[in-house]
Amino acid sequence: NRFNEETLSTPAEKNSNPVNVSPKELAAIVFTSGSTGPPKGVCYMHKTFDGQISALRENFGMQEGEVDMTTLPIFALFNPALGITTVMPEIDPSKPAKASAQSLVETLVDFEVTTAFASPVIGRKIADWCEHGNLRLPRMNRFFLAGAPSPPQLVEKLASVMDNGQVLIPYGATEALPVSYCTHADVMRARKGIEQGEGSCLGKALPGVSIKLFPVSASPFGNEVEEINEGQVGEICVAGPTVTEEYYRMPGATFDSKFRYDSQIYHRMGDLGYFDVDLSLR
């Protein structure tokens, strides 16, 4: 037991008084993956975490008492605020392709995991192992796939081994998370178009999040920037309670990726997209 007797014998109220902070006060510095350059420190304010926790609870039904297997350490930050237990599998987050499929599935089963977040590489390992071993994941409520495009056949296979859960594909980045999401059913409806090259299904914006498309440009956006016409492909830009406002001590990077539009601070996701006939982001 890592808790000493003094800690265990201390009245709960002594350690439960919250610290008074401003919603815009810095709460954490979370670094990007570095996949598009040197990792940048993203400033998470207390209001950012509040927005993210609310989004996870209200949109995905995550509840106190659940057990989460997360393959990316950053997502373990949310669980204590949700009353959720975090289980970390034996995996090197920088080398997910080397993870043991057997170990991953055993972790899900042995710890009675109800929710999980992983890349499509991990999702495929789990789905394939379950399929070959004729295994089921009856306690899973949801499985998030993110970090790379999730092929429809993978989404379908993973959903098929979950008796009572669903596969969810959220869209976002360290600087803005989550932004939108789609379900297994959404992917199946769009499957033909996805396989014909119409783009991955990213779903619709979460409540309170604004997604707009702007002309593709390598230059910073100024006050004169205007949205593109309906049906065109543009750069995905987002604003809302889950969107951060600056990088830590990197004014140049902040200037390049943030801009003000309609009285809100938007973040440039660096991805191209369009809205389909159902107004879902692709």
Spans of model-derived segments:
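Conserved ATP-binding/catalytic segment of the ANL
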Residues: T32, E226-R282
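Structural core segment of the AMP-binding/adenylate-forming
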Residues: N1-L8, V109
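Conserved AMP-binding A3 loop
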Residues: N20, A27-S54, T85
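Conserved AMP-binding/adenylation subdomain of ANL enzymes
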Residues: D50-V67, L72-T114, W129
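Gly/Ser/Thr-rich phosphate-binding loop
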Residues: F3, I84, T115-F117, D128-G197, ...
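Short, flexible, glycine-rich and Lys/Arg-enriched loop motifs at helix boundaries
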Residues: M88-Q102, D163, M188-G197, A218-E226
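Conserved pre-ATP/AMP-binding loop-to-beta segment of ANL
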Residues: R2, T10-F31, P38, G61-V67
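Short Gly/Pro-enriched turn/cap motifs at secondary-structure boundaries
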Residues: N20, E198-A205, E227, S263-Q264
